[in-house]
Structures are given as C-alpha cells and as structure tokens.
Amino acid sequence: MTQGKASAQDVINALNLEPHLEGGYFRRTYQADHRDWLETAAGPRYLMTSIYYLLTEQSPVGQFHFNQSDILHYFHLGDAIEYSLIHADGSLQTVVMGNDVLAGQHLQLHVPGGIWKASRLLDGKNGFGLISEAVSPGFDFADMEMGNRQKLTTAFPQHRALIEQLTRDED
C-alpha cells in the first residue's frame, strides 16, 4: 500500500473486489487451469482455486455457509476476523484470524469440507480485514449451501443466538 492509512474502499478498488453472496467482497485470483480436472461426486472440479476475501465495517459478516471442499484461509492485513465453525456433531469452534500471534490469533486456518462456517470482522482501527482462501477441490457454487436460519437452529438449537447473528432472516 502507499503511505497513509488505506480504507476498505481503497482495498476493494486496488484488488478489483466485488460483493460476495455470503457478505463481504471477493475476487477469484487463481484456478488450476494447467492441471487435469478432479472428478467428484458432483462433477469435475479444478484441483484448486483461490480468492481474496474482505470484510468491512459496512459488510462485516460472512453468513453461515457449508462447503464440500477443504479451505485454507490466510490472513493478510487489517482487523482481526472471528470464525465460528459448527461441526456435524454440534460442537462449536471459534478461531480468530489476525496478525497478533502473541495474543493467540492465527495467520492460517484450515476448515475441512462438511463444516458450517461463518465469519465476522472484529472491532479495530482499520475498518476491514483481508484474507485469502485456497480451496481444494476447487470452489464451485454447486458445492456450497448458504445457511438457512430455521434449518440451522433446528439442527443446532444450542447455537441459536449465534446462528441468528450470522444468518440472514429469510422471512
């Protein structure tokens, strides 16, 4: 970045990001065009894809969603981002990605396929948090399910308050 404090809009413009379905902003930066496709139960997929993903004060939540593929997250800059992961057995895991490793924040996070995941920007001085994701097999919208509030609260009633915060009201 140039001298001075970058705003969320500066980062959106510099990286050519666009609004994401789950919240925040993104841009696909890589797909393994030079590799053979992987055959999956849902059809052929790239071996790997990667995106930039940005949460901002104006769009601070990545809504609960479910991916079939494994995803590696890499923190780059800005404010910390809290991830809420609901496993199939109903257990909840909370991980904070950020650059303060001495405070227990993580620079990398692996989320296996088959876990409900949501993220939210934590308060900080920047007004945004930027990560990258590497997805294998490569991301395809057919392999992703957005979290339905009623379905998730029925399946995981012990996490009702969190689910209500991190899903859209479909009514």
Predicted regions and their residues:
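Non-catalytic, conserved peripheral segments adjacent to functional cores
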Residues: 1-109, 119, 124-126, 137, ...
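A structural signal for short, well-ordered beta-strand segments and their strand-loop junctions
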Residues: 110, 130-132
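Extracellular beta-helix/beta-solenoid repeat scaffolds
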Residues: 113-114
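N-terminal segments that mediate ammonia production and transfer
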Residues: 132-134, 138-142
